Structures are given as C-alpha cells and as structure tokens.
Curated annotation (Swiss-Prot):
Enzyme class: transferase
This protein's pathway: Carbohydrate biosynthesis; 3-deoxy-D-manno-octulosonate biosynthesis; 3-deoxy-D-manno-octulosonate from D-ribulose 5-phosphate: step 2/3; Bacterial outer membrane biogenesis; lipopolysaccharide biosynthesis
Regions that span the bilayer: none
Entry protein name: 2-dehydro-3-deoxyphosphooctonate aldolase
GO cellular component: cytoplasm
Keyword Transferase: yes
Amino acid sequence: MKLCDFEVGLDKPFFLIAGTCVVESEQMTIDTAGRLKEICAKLNIPFIYKSSYDKANRSSGKSFRGLGMDEGLRILSEVKRQLGLPVLTDVHSIDEIEQVASVVDVLQTPAFLCRQTDFIHACARSGKPVNIKKGQFLAPHDMKNVIDKARDAAREAGLSEDRFMACERGVSFGYNNLVSDMRSLAIMRETNAPVVFDATHSVQLPGGQGTSSGGQREFVPVLARAAVATGVAGLFMETHPNPAEAKSDGPNAVPLNRMSALLETLVTLDQAVKRGPFLENDFN
C-alpha cells in the first residue's frame, strides 16, 4: 500500500505515527514534530506526525479538549509547511470530514466509532488514507467487516480501495483496564490491510483516575517490542515533552527524550523479524 510518499507492508520497515495526544500550542507542536522528524530521519523510519484538534471522548466534561478545529488545523498545516511532514488527525463526526480532509494527509477514526457504518463510509469517500482503530469491544476478526465497509464505499465512489489501515489499541478487560492480545495483530492481517499497533493507548487505564484516564507508560516498550516481534506494518505512539504536564493522556505518553532510544531498539528488532519468513500459515 502506498501511504503518503512511502510503501507500507510486512515486507517493508515499519512506519511511525507519533505526536502529542492533543494540539496544546503551536510552538510545542512544531518543536515536538521537529524533534521526531530528526529522530526518524536518523533511523530511516517513515514518519507521519499526529495530533488531535479536539478530544471528543473525554472522561469528564471539564477536561481539556483542544484549541478547536480551526486553530488546531491551522497549527497542523504549519507542521506541513514548516517541516514538510505529512500529518494525521482524528475526525469525530461526518460534518467534520470535508474540512479536515482539506488539510491533513491521513484521517483517523476513533475506536469507539468503528461500528458506525455511515461514518466509516464518509471517511472512505474522503479520498484520504484512513487509519481505522479497532474498538476496545471488538474481536480482531470482526475488523474485516469494518475494512470491507470502507472498501465498498470507496469502490462505489470510484476511489482506490487500497487506502485503509487496521489499528489495534487493546481490548477492555474488566473495569478501567485494557490488555493487548498479540494474536490480534496476526488475525487482523486477514483484512489484507496494513496492521498498525497503538502502543500508548494500549497501556491506558480508561477512566482509571475518576475524572480522567490513567495509564502505565512503563509498559509501552514491552508492548511495542512484542508487536514488532509479531510483525506489523506500522506503530502508533503518543509522546510529550513533559507527560506530567500533558493536557490529555499524559500517563500513557512516552517522554519525548526517550523516543530515540525506544525507536532504535524497535528498528533493530523489526529488521531481524522481517528478514525471515512469517511461519503462521505453516502451522495450520
């Protein structure tokens, strides 16, 4: 699959989607994107910057949601203009898609909306690549239906069907907890879409702090290594210069000053895994 200006797939090095959870300010966004660009250039990692102009799904109605669509998109457009990076952001309703698609390179659908057929159809008809997150309530094999919905809508609109990614971000396990089943990554390959692993939301503790979500960022390297060892096309990770002061999802964000070391390890592992054959089908 061609994504932005690079090819993605199990036979290619993993690509990275990374950035702050939410756009907090223009300067921090530019600085964070610039640092990530430097790291990824050094490690030869294809990179897409991500950040949200609005966090529609918050634990509390008083939580920070963002700077608004217009200002958030303006800042993301500055990332493109100043740094030459492709950008990704999530959309939350059909009404937002046209305006967002006019600015960003890749759309993302929130996990909780993966079963909303009209919404998936509208995203698919935007003509943009779409990173479709698997709901925390959804079995991995059910993602085939979601990807098929997107492909059907694209085909009916006369657009390419080869624009959709399936993203794993953990599954609900009791209250305020998520677990990651690495079998899901292999199962989701049956969609014939590139599989992306979200290593930071997978360690989230949804609503675990009462009016906000908690997280266990110390397990991000553990799950990221496991996912790369399983074999993925891409990784998704949120990062922040100072997670303790992040306005959204700080407890599961990777400190920006630790991203280089983590990614260096993951690149080495990815190269080793993709040198050999994937043997899953040989065991049937």
